[in-house]
Amino acid sequence: MVKLRLKRYGRKQQPTYRIIAIDAKNRREGKALKELGFYNPIKNSIQLDVQNIILFLKNGAKPTDTVFDILNKHQVFEQMKKE
């Protein structure tokens, strides 16, 4: 099963995350199938590749709780319903 989850980057006390598609059996820092976005909680900046995210969701990928909240904030699920 494929999951959409966050992969941690950055230094101590300065985390940044990439939103990735990864096999659920792999560890958090394992090799990603595809990088789908970027999240910086300090600056509160988010960049998403919406088309690829929708493609993975339609093919059965499950987002983690945090990724679900990020996608919901950017109305990705509403865009998915329109297509």
From Swiss-Prot:
Disulfide bonds: none annotated. GO terms for molecular function: structural constituent of ribosome. The keyword Ribosomal protein applies. InterPro entries: Ribosomal_bS16, Ribosomal_bS16_CS, Ribosomal_bS16_dom_sf. It is found in: Plastid, Chloroplast. One of its GO terms (cellular component) is small ribosomal subunit. GO terms for biological process: mitochondrial translation. It comes from the Eukaryota. Keywords: Chloroplast, Plastid, Ribonucleoprotein, Ribosomal protein. It holds the Pfam family Ribosomal_S16. Its main location: plastid. Belongs to the bacterial ribosomal protein bS16 family. This is Small ribosomal subunit protein bS16c.
